[in-house]
């Protein structure tokens, strides 16, 4: 098995490390945090493909935040972050159980009730 996967996106190339996340599953680990060039280029490409009339963007914490922020800035709108745990500041949080391919145990995702009202 090759140790990396060559990703071509928005005119850029990145070599992603392959990681075994289960006995029968290997994924190419894609972490864009800190890759300003990749975030800005993909944000511009995605922005151009989005329809008019979007009110909010929603993203999971934390890896998607920079890309979502860059797209929202271009759209001139705000965005909402779905958290991985209930935070003390949340009002009437909306909690959903999920199963990720990168973790063995079930997790929860949490949307602040105030953000849920916006959406």
Predicted regions and their residues:
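Short, glycine/charge-rich flexible loops or terminal/linker lids adjacent to PRPP-binding catalytic cores
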Residues: 77-119
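A generic local structural motif
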Residues: 43-46, 66-67, 107-114
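Active-site-facing substrate-recognition patch
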Residues: 1-54, 115
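Short Gly/Thr/Asp-enriched flexible loops that form oxyanion-binding sites at enzyme active sites
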Residues: 66-75
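Short, flexible loop segments at the rims of nucleotide/cofactor-binding pockets, characterized by
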Residues: 34-38, 58, 100-104
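Preference for short coil/turn "hinge" residues that link or interrupt alpha-helices
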Residues: 9, 20, 60, 102-107
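Short glycine-rich phosphate-binding loop at a beta-alpha junction
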Residues: 54-61
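Short alpha-helix boundary/capping motifs
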Residues: 40, 61-62
């Amino acid at each position: 098995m090759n140790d990396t996967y060559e990703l071509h996106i928005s005119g850029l190339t990145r070599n992603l490390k392959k990681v075994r996340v289960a006995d029968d599953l290997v994924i190419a680990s894609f972490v864009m945090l800190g890759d300003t060039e990749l975030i800005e280029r993909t944000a511009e490409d995605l922005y151009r493909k989005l329809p008019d009339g979007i009110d909010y963007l929603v993203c999971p914490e934390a890896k998607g935040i920079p890309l979502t922020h860059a797209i929202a800035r271009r759209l001139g709108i705000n965005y909402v972050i779905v958290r991985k745990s209930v935070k003390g500041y949340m009002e009437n949080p909306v909690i959903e159980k999920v199963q990720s391919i990168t973790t063995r145990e079930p997790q929860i995702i949490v949307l602040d009730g105030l953000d849920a009202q916006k959406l």
